[in-house]
């Protein structure tokens, strides 16, 4: 993409309404525009980053054997009355009456609808286990939306639902989701810690939240520092193996890690003092096992091998896709702007032409643009007639992991400059070497 033809409405000044880093930089980098309290338009750069995050979520869900579908944003209220949650959910749920005086709602979550789909089409234990998921916009009418996409009213969320014959199978689904989430967050450059948490309005007997440590987090968290040394890495997981998934979950849940809602001071104080940590965390996902809480009242049952009809065991598993953009920026930035991890960057590399209109630099930049694209990379070429300082400031603000700088003196010597946004380190090399280096880096992501 050529910046002269792109829509990137960057701001030079910090917006007064932005209280935290991610909100400030997302507005300044032209990623989002507020349309109402807690409701945002996603501008091209933000939308591109959002789709990168969503793609990783899809890839890891499918890797774990989960099946995508798409449910509507509007739901009939009668489904929620069946489960008993329509009156319990509170004012966060946006209730709507259509022209035929039917009660509807803008879904804050989808347990009822997915249970209705299941009971309409699945009748036998032979069709289990089954996990369905979708990525869809949700709405919760927060009383005080703030912090940009971190606590908005409308948000993009992945929510998945497992249906299993018995407790043991449902716990395997729970473990499978935890493993899948650990891999998902690490691919995004995040260390998200699974912490035992409270179930809230969704309910259930077992739940973990995934939290990214950050001073701007809404939750107080208590944890054993040993958990921050754990890395998922590039291990290959057999998601069908109960033993393997259980072992990974045990590894990640043995060190103490809890939110303030489930914190146990006595257990925490038994940890050696040098490993006890208190911080704040941003919730980026949560998994639940809730047994037959929804299947029983809504009649989601299957016939077993001996002819008995039993309610299925269920769980739900959510990732805040749009919220992840804010969490990534909170965890990865400096005073100049965003620093995108390579796995989620909207563009792979920025090209800065120091002397637009100079035939040698123009030709070199065009060749770089063409060669990078041929390698499957997406460059953002700043071909604007702007001073070099303004171009560098824009690149630092939007935070692409790599920048190639092309100037007349370098071209005369057969060199370009490749700069790492995170470290600030620069290296001169030929254009071909820069292209090969970047292709190698991104091939491993």
From Swiss-Prot:
Record-given protein name: Proline--tRNA ligase
Subunit note: Homodimer.
Enzyme nomenclature, EC number: 6.1.1.15
Reactions the enzyme catalyzes: tRNA(Pro) + L-proline + ATP = L-prolyl-tRNA(Pro) + AMP + diphosphate
UniProt-annotated location(s): Cytoplasm
Protein function: Catalyzes the attachment of proline to tRNA(Pro) in a two-step reaction: proline is first activated by ATP to form Pro-AMP and then transferred to the acceptor end of tRNA(Pro).
Gene Ontology cellular-component annotations: cytosol
Family: Belongs to the class-II aminoacyl-tRNA synthetase family. ProS type 2 subfamily.
Alphabetically ordered keywords of this record: Aminoacyl-tRNA synthetase, ATP-binding, Cytoplasm, Ligase, Nucleotide-binding, Protein biosynthesis
GO biological process, one term: prolyl-tRNA aminoacylation
Protein biosynthesis among keywords: yes
Originating species: Cereibacter sphaeroides (strain ATCC 17025 / ATH 2.4.3)
Annotated GO MF terms: ATP binding; proline-tRNA ligase activity
